Amino acid sequence: MQSCRDVADLDDVLELSELPSGRSWNGAIAFLDRDGVLNIGSSDYVNNAAELIVIEGVAKAVGELRRGGYRICIVTNQSPIGRGFWDHECLADIHAELRRKLLEQDKDAILDLILYCPYAPWDNSECRK
């Protein structure tokens, strides 16, 4: 049971966009959770792109991290997939909307990588955080 990568296979080559102002990358990575950090979470889950509400100021914070030389990696548990509530494509739509909303507010708020664990807690997957 391994983790999954948004819109690509886990083993695919990761193509990174340039950091702002042509800054060189020194290997710094900011690992961020999604629900409750970037967007408002819900006990009933964020079930579709229309339900996604980005927390105020988050896009600027992500942009500032990138302007400071950090790559942004989102790590998130997404057990609704393992519970059968929705599929990987639904999650890809939610993540596309997250990316769109962040970039709408700050052109540098690029998410370099999103890793997620689709398994339910009782699956005892090591990829759950």
What is the role of each PLM region?
Residues 48, 52, 85-89, 129:
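Charge-dense, low-complexity intrinsically disordered segments
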Residues 58, 62-95, 110-126:
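Substrate-recognition element of Asp-dependent hydrolases with the DxDx(T/V) motif
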Residues 1-34:
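Non-catalytic pre-domain segments flanking phosphatase-related domains
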